[in-house]
Amino acid sequence: MSFKKLIFIFIFITAVSQSIADTKITSDDNHQMNFYLGNFDFSDHKQKALLVGFQHQDENLSRDTILGNVSPITGGFVTENSAAYIYTGIEWNVDMGSMVFTPSFAPGLYHEGDGKDLGHILEFKSEVQLSYEPSDTTNIGLSYNHVSHASLDDKNPGANSYMFNFLKKF
């Protein structure tokens, strides 16, 4: 997929989301931190590595849409091979009773350290997460993501990761 197509899709999704969003911004002072631990690039046996990360969600900026609850996210992770990724993006929280389905998209900056060369500093993270909500302030879940630069350069191996998540609202 070309970079121009990716930008067009991102702008289209943003415009549609804002046009159908409920204009009321939630007034709660809730923030959510997601602490996660997992396996970076588990599908590449030579490059797979342990990763640890965090993600912040500010529910003061969330909006209810027909797609579910949409909110901005910011986070990052490091691997045991000193690779690092910092990102900011958007996630959709789809409430399914005591379960929450959360797809997200976040562009960010990647530093390979002694880890895998992903081919570019600008990378895009797409993720799906399924979590269980045992209480109003705590979720535990499992997530899968793919980090890739969408063919901005010739080399584009991408990385697939899975994580165990602990989410806490405060």
Feature locations, PLM:
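Solvent-exposed loop/turn segments connecting transmembrane beta-strands
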Residues: F40-L50, G76-Y87, D114-I121, S151-A159
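Mid-chain, well-packed structural core segment of small domains
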Residues: M99-S126
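Transmembrane beta-strand segments that form the barrel wall of outer-membrane beta-barrel proteins
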Residues: Q32-D41, L67-T79, T102-H111, S143-S148
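Outer-membrane beta-barrel architecture
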Residues: Y36, G53-Q55, G89-E91, Q129, ...
